[in-house]
């Protein structure tokens, strides 16, 4: 599933690193990869 993970506490973790977003996307959205969209401070999951 692709898309932004929403406002479920990803803003702070996004500032820290992309790895957290990547892990969250794989675990919660069953996506293949995830990265931080810095301008919006949100995780984006791809695949």
From Swiss-Prot:
Intracellular or extracellular location(s): Secreted
Major subcellular location class: secreted
TM segment ranges: none
Tissue and organ distribution: Expressed by the venom gland.
LCN-type CS-alpha/beta domain: residues covered: 1-47
A molecular-function term among this protein's GO annotations: toxin activity
InterPro entries named in the record: LCN-type_CS_alpha_beta_dom, Scorpion_toxin-like_sf, Scorpion_toxinL, Scorpion_toxinL/defensin
Assigned keywords, A-Z: Disulfide bond, Neurotoxin, Secreted, Toxin
Cysteines joined through disulfide linkages: 14-36, 21-43
Stored SUPFAM superfamilies: Scorpion toxin-like
GO cellular component, one term: extracellular region
Domains: entry comment: Has the structural arrangement of an alpha-helix connected to antiparallel beta-sheets by disulfide bonds (CS-alpha/beta).
Family the UniProt entry places it in: Belongs to the long (4 C-C) scorpion toxin superfamily. Sodium channel inhibitor family. Beta subfamily.
Reported function: Causes transient paralysis of the rear legs of and spasms in insects (A.domestica).
The protein, known as: Putative beta-neurotoxin
């Amino acid at each position: 599933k692709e898309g932004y993970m929403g406002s479920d506490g990803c803003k702070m973790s996004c500032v820290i690193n992309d790895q957290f977003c990547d892990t969250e996307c794989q675990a919660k959205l069953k996506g293949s990869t995830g990265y931080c969209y810095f301008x919006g401070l949100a995780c984006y999951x791809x695949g």
